[in-house]
A protein has these predicted regions:
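Nucleotide/phosphate-binding sheet-loop regions of phosphoryl- and nucleotidyl-transfer enzymes
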Residues: 1-389, 416, 422-425, 430-437, ...
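Membrane-bilayer interface helices and TM-boundary transition segments
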Residues: 444-448
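Long, structured protein-protein interaction/assembly regions in large complexes
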Residues: 401-415, 422, 429
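Long, terminal "pre-/pro-" and other extracytoplasmic accessory regions
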Residues: 218, 235, 391, 399-405, ...
Length: 448
């Protein structure tokens, strides 16, 4: 029997992190727990290692196995790649065995092309949603797979909003988004000298290669170095049937922790955006709402979500960091993992889990990273000086401590100034994964 490089979510489990990566193993585990996880499959970390051995190529054996699993996914969902009546659209996401939030790349809405988008608009009776999904896909594919910078597409969006006299992407109508998709394809051709690919299978293989390649992008390398993650581990790739948070005002997407990662308080902590897709929440494109506001907007989905949060925390016996999408009021879970937390939160969570009977005292001690304990001795401002200080801005604390430095407005400036011996505070409207090096060099980060 030939080597197995691909697993359906239903074939894996939470103990297969080395092979399926953290995200793939947890998607398999949630699937086995009967949670609402969109169907899909995981291409293993071994396939990534083989990709690098084969000089950045996916060999014929692995490609054939991937296509076999595409057919299985088509059978399971009743949808087909490129079909004009019931098209299969997928997301392609990375998933290393160690959690690396935001460090590698994601592509959504793969499978759309010029013909499918027209059929998709008719099938959903929602042309705005169809063309919004298509323009997002063209932008992500161009950026992640072909390495055409996001800025060119963001400039086209800004020009369109200015032309229409609106401030938000959500205020653009179907015709505006259709026009944007055409402009995006023209930009793609202008930058690369070729047409945007229309064959979903070519799109898929390009996306998988891009995720493998993203294991060695500069921010991933830097994150691995900071966190002692071996470079030869590679990343898995998760191919999952799409669910849509951007169909309208009964859909949305969000991220949440089962407890507050800054303080350890036993209360859901997170945010969501209505009529949005996954990356929007963390990309800082629009300002999200807090997770407790979901109870007012969609009470049934919120109740189901809180029940799932409790089950996941009980199952993993630790605080969870989750991603979810709501499509037309129906909740889907896209990820869970043990959440990153401050040292102070780690102490509180460990003690609370003991009190709640979830873990033993010995397990609680083992949960605390010894290296994190020095952060409990974090610097603080002199209370007397604070009273005299003039407040020029406020924000929500994401970690304990105080910081002092010159204000800078870009991650690049923060890095350059810090390397020249200056103390800096990085100020951004919202942070994004590209800011990681500047955030590391800054004394503090403020989002306003």
């Amino acid at each position: 029997m030939s080597h197995k490089y691909v697993y359906l979510f239903s074939e894996g489990n939470g103990h297969m992190r080395e092979l399926l990566g953290g995200k793939g193993a947890n998607l398999a585990e949630m699937t086995n727990l009967g949670m609402p996880v969109p169907q899909g499959f995981t291409i293993t970390t071994e396939a990534c290692t083989q990709y690098y051995k084969d000089d950045h190529q996916i060999n014929a054996e692995i490609e054939a196995e991937i296509m076999e699993y595409v057919e299985k996914l088509e059978e399971m969902t009743g949808k087909k790649f490129g079909d004009l009546y019931n098209p299969l659209l997928v997301s392609v996401r990375s998933g290393a065995r160690a959690s690396m939030p935001g460090m590698m790349d994601t592509i959504l809405n793969l499978g759309l092309n010029d013909e499918v988008v027209v059929a998709f608009a008719k099938k959903t009776n929602n042309p705005r949603f169809a063309y919004d999904s298509y323009r997002r896909f063209i932008q992500m594919y161009s950026d992640v797979v072909m390495e055409v910078g996001k800025k060119y597409f963001e400039q086209l969006i800004d020009e369109m909003k200015e032309k229409k006299g609106v401030k938000l992407d959500t205020e653009l109508d179907a015709n505006d988004l259709k026009e944007l998709a055409e402009k995006f394809k023209a930009e793609y051709k202008d930058k690369l000298g070729e047409e945007f690919p229309q064959d979903p299978k070519i799109q898929l293989m390009g996306a998988i290669k891009a995720v493998f390649r993203s294991w060695d992008n500069p921010r991933a390398i830097y994150y691995r170095r900071m966190n002692d993650i071996p470079s030869d581990w590679g990343t898995a790739v998760n191919v999952q049937s799409m669910v849509f948070g951007n169909t309208g005002d009964t859909s949305g997407t969000g991220v949440a922790f089962t407890r507050n990662p800054a303080t350890g308080e036993k209360k859901l902590f997170g945010e969501f955006l209505m009529n949005a897709q996954g990356e929007d929440v963390v990309a800082g494109v629009r300002t999200p709402q807090t997770i407790d506001q979901l109870a007012e907007v969609m009470p049934e989905a919120y109740k189901q979500f809180t029940d799932i949060c409790a089950k996941l925390e009980y199952h993993y016996r630790d605080m969870q960091d989750m991603e979810f999408t709501i499509e037309d009021k129906k909740l889907y879970m896209l990820q869970t993992r043990n959440g990153k937390r401050t040292a102070a939160a780690a102490m509180k969570i460990a003690c609370d889990l003991v009190d709640e009977g979830m873990i033993t005292e010995e397990e609680a001690v083992a949960m605390i990273d010894p290296k994190s304990l020095d952060s409990l001795l974090h610097p603080t401002f002199d209370p007397a000086a604070l009273k005299k200080a003039k407040v020029v801005g406020t924000g929500l604390a994401a970690s304990p401590g105080a910081a002092c430095g010159q204000i800078v407005f870009s991650a690049e400036t923060a890095t350059d100034w810090a390397k020249n011996g200056k103390k800096v505070v990085l100020v951004r409207l919202e942070t994004s994964p590209e800011d990681i090096e500047g955030m590391h060099y800054a004394q503090g980060v403020l989002t306003v």
